[in-house]
């Protein structure tokens, strides 16, 4: 297995590079083939746990392939969802959209299989910088702005993560990605956790999610709803299992997302808010940290990727066919889009934890783990959040899109109809899996990190079925009694991002007005009181240098130069030559006188 081990990210990255180079005639086959190969690479790893793809780098070892039960369950569903999403997007002609989606998935899978923090950070940033194009490819002004905010937030999260990793390496000298000492947390522990929970969309670090997912392309939103937050759940489960602070954070997410989903008028933004709620269950489960809770987090992530992807595909189909996604502009579409209605209904029943659907066998595992760990308050509040889930996603979405008052314009009504065949096939596959998992639990339970614990959990007990049906039926009764109050309105719900958006404007005003005014005043005062005296002083010293110091120096230099000329004459030998010549003449005269 070591020699034949293939990283699914390598398959997707290679496919992303090759796809734009292929002729259009073969692209559709290739778009399906690449995810199939990536899914096959994960299937080949089943039963072959171990460490693969270790690469020496400077003084470290980069581990690209840590294969165990925890990584495999996430890799399995992520590659499967990549295949479903690629089929859903077959009608998209722009190759760059498919390439961006595959690079995004490759980043997620790289994080799933990594064994060290350096590799994790590499793939973590790959996720952020590739997924933003799934927002920008919609090519609207709002999408460009939303993508820019998305990138800024994730860049900040990446910096927090990097700071934590650097501090951890300095303190421990270890880059291995594994459990962090939650019993004795250090500063780097909280920095790393902050980087992770930002991707999990934990309030108040959550506003990027509905902002970006609501503005993404139809196919891009299907990919985005499946990978970023679930990758964050994986890294939290790997490194922060049992971190108690995650329990209240997760419960807060579950309730917060439900409230804002009820208020939302846009279908895809509603689903985005509900991602926050459902991921809250997983975060709380990681905080509980028991084997049953970790199983619940993994199982719910598995199911959530499928049914949330199905819901985004259904609402995306409505947007694709009609150009509209607001409830106040839709209604009565079950006649025009009957197949899409059925698929979306399956997703709504799954997310509402209706018996025989996937959410029923996964969500309750987390609630049961909470009660088992004596976190009764968490168990009760998560049960309350389940009622809210059925209220907005199980009832509000189907009612105001498919039934209810027909608010469609004539153009919207004429354009409405079931989407292209590839989109229907993708929704059908996801819908089938939602039902299959709910009816045959061993398919999912046997993949979980603690299969023995999962085998002892029985979701179809009389008490659980009775409790669930009571919650669902009373929620439905409340929905229809309060239907007028729950009717969507064409308004915008203010979220916590208002504070940093307004804070940004306040900072901009503060920089332009008070700070700039003070800077101008100080500058003018300096010009009057500082620059003028300084220039006068400079001119004086320039004059003194020119007429004083330079005169002395130049005069001295001229004297030295003259003396040097004299000394040079002596040193050169001219005087000696004259003396010798005179001596020679005298000697010659004396000789002549002697012989004459």
Report each predicted region and the residues it spans.
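Transmembrane helix-loop-helix hairpins at membrane boundaries of multipass inner-membrane proteins
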Residues: 1-99, 173-182, 505
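Membrane-interface helix termini and inter-helical loops of multi-pass transporters
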Residues: 50-65, 172-182, 237-239, 363-370, ...
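Aromatic-capped, Gly/Pro-kinked transmembrane alpha-helices
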Residues: 444-466, 486-596
